Amino acid sequence: MLKRVVPLLFVVFGSTLILSLLLQLLPVGLKDLYIAPGDEASVNEQLKSLGLDGNAFTFYFHWLNDFVRGNFGYIIFPGGGREPVSNRLSTALPISLRLVVYVQIVALLVSIPLGIYTAYRAGRRSDRVISYSLFAAASIPNFVFGLLLAIFVGVQLGWLPPLGYVPPSEDFVEHIKTMILPVLSLAIPTIATYSRLLRSDVIAALREDYVTMAASKGLSNRRILFTHVLRPSSTTLFTSAALNMGALIGGTLVIEQIFAIPGLGSEIGIAIFSRQFFALQSYIALIAVFYVIFNGVIDVVLGFVDPRTRERRNA
């Protein structure tokens, strides 16, 4: 476990360090953006509080020290006003995580039976039609689905709200209505990817000798599927789903702005366009941290789903 986590921690460290160094290359310096005019003592105090009183590496380690202690920096307004990034995260992050969880639930509920069906009908007409459709869906960016769904389903047909977000604590039914279109926008290409992965693994499992032997013993197709085929075949699917959690959080950047959902993706967009680079650095670091966490969790889960995975790691 430790051997797998340590390299991922270097990913977090490296990605945030590179971003921090890139911030030093901005045409407008960070000092010009965030330091309010004042006397020398006031300016020096502001520089020290933001870690801008040294070189690029001093700035990075000042930020990193604050980040690991839960201080994600500040959103700095013209004139020197500040708002802790944690205030925005406390509302935006749960919304994005809720969206990602919904997407994963929908994607897995659809892709697992779809992948099994196409695997058992491999080479037939229905398999070819579904496979070509899935390939096309996987090739289209999720924001294209978002725009199409918002325009046709939300605006022209008026079946669902094209914009806005209602918290589940206020009205759960309206919450579900406002989440359907953004969830579908992210879920459609995800379903395509998951289904194709599971289809390939199920086809490979069906060709294994132990499956042929189980069939020769008279075991039912249902028992063969759930006992001998689906369990080892789900390894790649679960791995992909876990790794995709971080990608989905990044994918919410455009989708949340299309549907006016006040999540982490929207906050990243706001930080970019309003040049709130301290907040942006913390947002990207959090996505990297979630990526590491999901990798660690899936590493443990795969050991239970497929013991061969654990044996290969311990070999």
Where are these regions (language model features)?
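Membrane-water interface segments at the C-terminal ends of transmembrane alpha-helices
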Residues: 18-26, 51-54, 65, 133-161, ...
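Hydrophobic alpha-helical transmembrane segments of membrane transport/permease proteins
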Residues: 11-61, 157-178
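Alpha-helical transmembrane segments of integral membrane proteins
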Residues: 12, 89, 93-126, 142, ...
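Transmembrane-helix boundary motif in ABC transporter permease subunits
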Residues: 20, 24-25, 76-79, 103-135, ...
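N-terminal signal-anchor/signal peptide hydrophobic helix marking the start
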Residues: 2-8
